């Protein structure tokens, strides 16, 4: 399986809401002592962990699909799981979904265009900004102080769920690990 965490490259974005996917990949890499794979044509940081590949596209969010399709095609991977931030869920929510629309998320839009909509998703709720016109600044901002105290546990729970996908069905993992909010 190819497990992708969406985010933006660079230290300026490292602790932002939009980079929650990267944070989960970092946790999975840490837990599994995954081996880095170097290949510039993948346009991302790629790791091998047992039977899985872990990817952080380094293309910026709106071009994530090019990195995903490069890895998917090179290794002939059928199953893809994408971890991403979701404005439509309250902070701390964790939901699992197969296929569906991109909901205005540019990383998902790019992924859909590259590999189709037929992939599994881990939706991580980041809440909504107060005003609709503030979406871009909201997703590119760090988490609030009161959210930061829950971040490690939330990321750990998402990583636990993803690890369980090796031995449990997607529906069973969804039932066991879905969180409405923290």
Which positions does each model-derived feature cover?
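Nucleotide and nucleotide-moiety/phosphate-recognizing core
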Residues: 2-98, 109-122, 130-134, 141, ...
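Gly/charged, well-structured mid-domain segments that form the phosphate/adenylate-handling core
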Residues: 126
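Hydrophobic alpha-helical segments within soluble ligand-binding/sensing domains
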Residues: 104-107
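Short glycine/threonine-rich catalytic loop with a Thr-x-Gly-x-Asp
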Residues: 101
